[in-house]
Amino acid sequence: MPKKEKMAKTPLSDEKQLLLFQQKLLAEEEMAKKKERLLSQFLKDKLAKEEHNSALNLNKINTQWRTVLREVKTRELHKDIEILSQTFERVVDCKDNVIKSLAKDLSEAEEQYAHALRSHLHNVDQLLALQRHRLSLLEESYNMELEALTKEFETERKTIIDQHEKEIHYLQDIFMAMEQNYIDSEYESKLEFQSMWNDLKNMNLEEKHFLRLHLENRVEDLWRKFQDVLKNYTDATEDRKAAFETLQVKDEKSSKEIEVQMKKIQKLQDAITISKGKIMIHSRESEDENRYIRNDKELVLVQLRKLKAQRTQARAASQKNLVRLTLESNATLKALRKIVDKGEKILKLAEICRKFETEEEKVLPFYSSVLTPKEQEGIQKNNLEELTEELTKVMVDYIGMENFWKRYNKVKLEQLSLQHRRAQLLDINGKLREMLKQYLDGISVSDEVLSQLNPLFIVNYQSNLLQPLSIRIAHPGDKQHPTT
């Protein structure tokens, strides 16, 4: 009996060992899972702290950056305000001068307007008197012509009405005849259509009956052939059919046995693969989770570095764009101010020069071209062929300035001609002054005249012209002439 008890206790100890081993494995798995959870929680807390710290640092940097930008902006605004105040004072002074000049022009224009209005009213009164007399004469002639036209209209109206009535009767007769012809032709066409329709119907019925008989005969022949072929096939395959049925029964039995054995083998293989798979899955899951956590950590660090770099780049780019925008805006404002000032100067000069325009320039401000239209078209085509597309597009925007450049060129030509004429007159004036001076010098005697060279002027038998020195050798036979 004790031997039997010992033999019975040995398998129980093995089962306990297996249970203890399984419990240890489960405890180790639970400990590993707890460690993984604690590690993931620690990493999440650390990531949250880093995000919180990065947000605080970003807010601090933004506040300091805003203060720096405000200081820079205030300095720029102070400079802009000083520049604007100076420009405003300068513009106010210019405007005051313009207002004074315009007030003078306005007073002169009012005087001219009053004088022109008086002369205009006098001329209008004279024209009204002439127009009333002319209207009375025209009214008399109009009444006479109206009576003659009414008489002619009445006679023409009567003749036209009579002719219209005759034409209406003629057209009614024609319409009745055409309607009768249409009714006759319609009746004949209907009869022809009915006869043709009946003929076609009869032909279709005959063709249909013939085709039906032909098809019925053909179907009967095909059915006889099919019955013969079926009978021959059944007679030839009866023996093969019996052998096939016996083999089919044997095949079903063997297939059932094979299926039972395969199911048993499959169950055993499934159990083995499941146990192996569980072990591999647990090990792989732990390795994969650790690897995923490491990869996530590296990715988070890389993304954090990228975000910091992008933030610095974006800040530098925004600062550059802001500086460039301010510089470009200031440059554009200056250019626009120059253009506006230039336009105002042009308008002022135009108003000032309008006083000095002649009557011809007021009536025809733009001179007509000397060239013919064909020559102008040829010149325009040549210019367009030589220019590029961009220049042509730009020139289209400035077509409205042609009249301005006409007046400008006209004024420039007049200026050049006046300068040339002035130079000629100054030259003539200088020559006349020189001639007048020579004439006056020949008439009068003064210190200036005495100091200048003059071959006609002799004082004490001596001229003021420089004479060349002559050396003369005295001979014994020569006589000296007394000086006069």
From Swiss-Prot:
The lineage of its organism: Eukaryota, Metazoa, Chordata, Craniata, Vertebrata. Belongs to the DRC2 family. This is Dynein regulatory complex subunit 2. Keywords: Cell projection, Ciliopathy, Cilium, Coiled coil, Cytoplasm, Cytoskeleton, Flagellum, Kartagener syndrome, Primary ciliary dyskinesia. GO terms for biological process: axonemal dynein complex assembly; cilium assembly; cilium-dependent cell motility; regulation of cilium movement. Highly expressed in adult testis, in spermatocytes and spermatids. Also observed in spermatogonia. Not detected in Leydig cells, nor in fetal testis (at protein level). Transmembrane segments: none annotated. Component of the nexin-dynein regulatory complex (N-DRC), a key regulator of ciliary/flagellar motility which maintains the alignment and integrity of the distal axoneme and regulates microtubule sliding in motile axonemes. Plays a critical role in the assembly of N-DRC and also stabilizes the assembly of multiple inner dynein arms and radial spokes. Coassembles with DRC1 to form a central scaffold needed for assembly of the N-DRC and its attachment to the outer doublet microtubules. It is linked to Ciliary dyskinesia, primary, 27: A disorder characterized by abnormalities of motile cilia. Respiratory infections leading to chronic inflammation and bronchiectasis are recurrent, due to defects in the respiratory cilia. Patients may exhibit randomization of left-right body asymmetry and situs inversus, due to dysfunction of monocilia at the embryonic node. Primary ciliary dyskinesia associated with situs inversus is referred to as Kartagener syndrome. Its main location: cytoplasm. GO terms for cellular component: axonemal dynein complex; axoneme; ciliary basal body; motile cilium. Residues 92-160, 374-403 form a coiled coil. It is found in: Cytoplasm, Cytoskeleton, Flagellum basal body; Cell projection, Cilium, Flagellum; Cytoplasm, Cytoskeleton, Flagellum axoneme. Component of the nexin-dynein regulatory complex (N-DRC). Interacts with DRC1.
